[in-house]
Amino acid sequence: MEKHRARALGRDSKASRRKGLPSAPPAGPYELGEKRPKLHLNIRTLTDDMLDKFASIRIPKGSKKERPPLPQLKTVSGSSDYSSVSSETMENNPKSLSENEVLKLFEKMMEDMNLNEDKKAPLREKDFSIKKEMVMQYINTASKTGSLRSSRQISPQEFIHELKMGYTGERLFTYLESLRVSLTSNPVSWVQNFGHEGLGLLLDILEKLINGQIQEKVVKKTQHKVIQCLRALMNTQYGLERIMSDERSLSLLAKAMDPKQPSMMADVVKLLSAVCIVGEESILEEVLEALTSAGEERKIDRFFSIVEGLRHNSVQLQVACMQLINALVTSPDDLDFRLHLRNEFMRCGLKEILPNLKGIKNDGLDIQLKVFDEHKEEDLSEFSHRFEDIRAEFDEASDVYSVVWDTVKETRAEGHFVSILQHLLLIRNDRFIRQQYFKLIDECVSQIVLHRDGIDPDFTYRKRLDLDLSQFVDVCIDQAKLEEWEEKASEHCKKFEKECTDHQETQAQLQKKEAKINELQAELQAFKSQFGALPPGTKIPLQTSAKGEPGPSAFPPAPPALGAGVPPPPPPPPPPPPPLPGMAMPFGGPVPPPPPLGFLGGQNFIPLNLPFGLKPKKEFKPEISMRRLNWLKIGPNEMSENCFWIKVNENKYENKDLLCKLENTFCCLEKEKRDTNDFDEKKVIKKRMKELKFLDPKIAQNLSIFLSSFRVPYEKIRTMILEVDEAQLSESMIQNLMKHLPDEEQLKSLSQFRSDYNSLCEPEQFAVVMSNVKRLRPRLTAILFKLQFEEQVNNINPDIMAVSTACEEIKKSKSFSKLLELVLLMGNYMNAGSRNAQTFGFDLSSLCKLKDTKSADQKTTLLHFLVDVCEEKHPDILPFVDDLAHLDKASRVSVEMLEKSLKQMGRQLLQLEKNLETFPPPEDLHDKFVIKMSSFIITAKEHYGKLSTLLDNMTQLYQSVMSYYAVDTKKVSVEEFFNDLNNFRTSFMQALKENIRKREAAEKEKRARIAKERAEKERLERQQEKKRLLEMKTEGDETGVMDSLLEALQSGAAFRDRRKRTPKLKDIRQSLSPMSQRPVLKVCNHENQKMQLSEGSRPHHSINCTSTRTPVAKELNCNLDTHTSTGRIKAVEKEACNAESNRKKEMELLGSVSKSESVPEVEALLARLRAL
């Protein structure tokens, strides 16, 4: 209430002043200047009202500035001397504070001292008396420093409220000035309370002032005051972190650089310089992006404002701009990037300004120029050092390797170079893959190293390249294989087709000869039965065997004469053995069927005597119910003696582990509910498009279309047809001509108008010309057949060869036979107890049903299980996919269409032969039809005979194969047989790929999980190490951060750490661990570090809190950026014992710059901020 009354009183007095009325006298009976008595307040009032108004004990006495009064803000009424209040109260009534009040004050004290939780924990465990004593000492100390003596304590919320009001002009300027003083004098807790919301308000005000484009003096003053408030906020670690984390802050600071306002620009440039030296490389990128955006908006170079600041007469601004240039140029670790930034500054005009700057007498400017020149010389020396040893010839790989090795050995790059070589060794030993990998690596390295477009690369892109090269490499490998194997494959295919054709033709001729032999033998038997035996003593003019015995085709001896004492002739020889499947009997009879098995009527009844030596199949009894394999069963009565299923022995694949795995995978856990909707097949009805027909076709119009499409003179077309010119005649031309040509009667009628040729239209003229050719349509039919004959042969021959070769492959493949045996074993085990149990064989079309049999968990199929078993236990089965290579092509062949095509070819040959016999003699000199067609028909008959022989042989082969596997040719066509096998082969290969991908995915997931765990472990180790580095500072002071950074920039100490990125070769001897390519730390000579050249690989460095631990922090932080290792940390800690003496020597070298500066404290602060 008192506070509200005081504000109301202030408003009334101001209102009276505006109206010309005298203001109300001050409250109380005392006049102005009269001494007031001490105000005695209870300590409880201090506890309740002043918790947020403790002053920091870190601010020295007398350093505070009196704040200017805030308009329309009334402070706490009365001027209380809190020093006397607190001291008197503590002396008179030391036990006036309750336990809760003391604990609240104790927590507030620790918060105001910026203690973390780890440091607060031991203090909370102290006795209450100790806590109370600490609180009293804290209040007493704060009272003595005068921090509790101010009468104008304003809370952060009041400042935030006033900033939200949107005041402008002098009023806003007054608020900001008061805010700057409060941010400077109040404790960190006050700054934190204001920064949560106040920072965004300050940036909003700054953005409005920058974008307002108002050049009034008060606006510039206000803008400068906002910059000063930001600087005061950044003077704490909290404020610095907030500024660096806000996206707009750096962009607005870059836009606020105005050489016309030297004082404000100096403050802006200093803040950006501090951010550059304390932030990580990402902060540097953000600063450069902010400068680039500001330059683009103003349509100037991004560094133009900085260089213009150097042209100004203000030495303070010149020093600040040189500080920012040094911070930008020395921050990147990459040498090329540093050279790029420095050259960009030179192009903007720095080269012309440097001589003038060196003529100015100023110690601070001299320090910055010296830092700039030293870093420039070191970078140029390092750059020139790259090319010192490049004097060798690069034609030989050994010479190039020697040069590269001399360049990287005993440097930090050595580990990466060895890593590159090791990775090159990991390329798979395949000549196609190796070539494509090296080609890809060469292209990537070329694009990284060379910049042929004449401009610099995008140095702002600092992220890692994550490229998925597997698909690209696969494409390159496939392309290389195709290029190399294309010629070889075509040659081998031609040779193979020729050999197969010869082989098939030879077999066909052999079969013909055997048939001829059988025919002759039949005639011989008929002759013997008709004429009887020869008289005794007759010589048989037949060829005998080598031993003088008659050959197999010799006539038998004649029977003896009646009455002779000769024994009767021996009985006839036994019948010959049954022929092979597909072969005819000796006298042309078919193979007799096996005896009927009338006793095989029952399904579950096991016959006692099975045909062809079959033995009953083993009966399996699984412990649990199994899913069924729905195959088509083949009974013994459907098999022939040489059938495949007679000889199978699937028991050799029986394995306890296999059967247990099969049982666990395909067991029936519960009755599945099937959704009937899943079985509704959507039949796609293909609508047959009706062929379009001319409703009123006109011959003249058709001929016009034909003639316009070819544009050949009519006489020339006639000559081409008479000469049978295959070079100019084409199939489409002949077909269109036959289609649109008038019939013979119309042609004869048009021949009467030869005298009126010129008066006829073009189609009629063409018809008149063509009417002179005798028997035109038979000619065109024969020519078209001749043009298409070669294509027909080339189409029929490969199809016949594909089917024939596929039949041989199916029958001869041992791996395919083993696969069928394994499937038979698995099927009998799964079907145990059902009607399909104890099966002797199954129809090959059942193989396609393997992928339809799901496992118990619905995650795999029986086909995938079979593939997995073959991979693990029976790898000799997998080659069946290659054994049946021609199965794919054979599955696309229609045997019925082959037979029709061959019959059509035979009919065309007969028709052509009849036409040649009845063709009239030629009357025109150009008529060569009979001559060319007579020679063509001879060649065509020869090819037709070969194709007929090959087709007969193919028919016998597939009949033999289907009989071999007990396939009923009446129920299953050849196309269905090959399609089923090809679908199974394709599904098997697909399942094989899916199993491989599944294993690779599982392995990849495992590696990713291990890598993630390793990365998380390393991250935790890095966090613990950073936490340890943060706790190494003994004091809890978090204020004065920006003051220390600006001091470091001004003295040049902030840039010394950047000059020690990488020592010279002889100062740091790095070795490579035999088990890893990571560098192992060795002892560093920090005394000579400054005078040596740095290497191109520049890792981040940090400076530790104390001078004795500085080298340790540097090396440790370097390793934390890559891989944290216990061995490295131990090696670094061993180095710490000798670091103090080296650090003292280094301090002597640095003393010439500024003897009064506190270098360890500055570097410790930098190290701590970088660690954060």
From Swiss-Prot:
Keywords: Coiled coil, Cytoplasm, Nucleus, Phosphoprotein, Repeat, Ubl conjugation. The keyword Coiled coil applies. Ubiquitinated. Residues 553-581 have a biased composition (Pro residues). Residues 1-15 have a biased composition (Basic and acidic residues). GO terms for molecular function: actin binding; cytoskeletal protein binding; microtubule binding; protein homodimerization activity; small GTPase binding. A motif (Nuclear localization signal) lies at residues 16-39. Residues 616-1014 form the FH2 domain. GO terms for biological process: actin crosslink formation; actin cytoskeleton organization; actin filament bundle assembly; actin filament organization; actin filament polymerization; actin nucleation; autophagosome-lysosome fusion; cell projection organization. It is found in: Cytoplasm; Nucleus. Actin nucleation and elongation factor required for the assembly of F-actin structures, such as actin cables and stress fibers. Required for cytokinesis, stress fiber formation and transcriptional activation of the serum response factor. Binds to GTP-bound form of Rho and to profilin: acts in a Rho-dependent manner to recruit profilin to the membrane, where it promotes actin polymerization. DFR proteins couple Rho and Src tyrosine kinase during signaling and the regulation of actin dynamics. Belongs to the formin homology family. Diaphanous subfamily. This is Protein diaphanous homolog 3. It comes from Rattus norvegicus (Rat).
